Amino acid sequence: MYKRQVLLGATAFSLVLRGLGGDELIEGALLSLPFEPTGIIIAILFATFLLGFFLDWIELTLIVLPLVAPVVASLGFDPIWFTILFAVCLQTSFLTPPVGFAIFYLKGVAPQGIPVTTIYAGVVPFIIAQVLGMLIIFNWQAVVTWLPAQAYG
């Protein structure tokens, strides 16, 4: 039941925000940043990373992605590449303190007596792997766009 309510609320918020011109305001703000296009993408991913500390993936995907997708397209980036990069960024933020949703899910199924600090220490290699994966995807778009290009032309 919770997921349906979140889905409904996030969709309603996104529609109201876009209906009131919030998407145009955000697009204008992002495009006016004093960065090159890759800097704007990094700023979007950084904001997404920070939001991932506090919001679930459904909210972020339904609210943030539709707002930044036109900016990404206008900058000339592949939408498949950006969406995968966005998803990896979200996953990384879910592993990272201060909140770390994935860590608390793991704590719920871990045997009694394992402290959260041990789980935080154990997740560090996975965070490093996620960040390396993001860097690879960011610098070599073909890693994630080659297969869809082969499948869909």
Where is each model-derived feature located?
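Alpha-helical transmembrane segments of multi-pass membrane transport proteins
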Residues: K3-G153
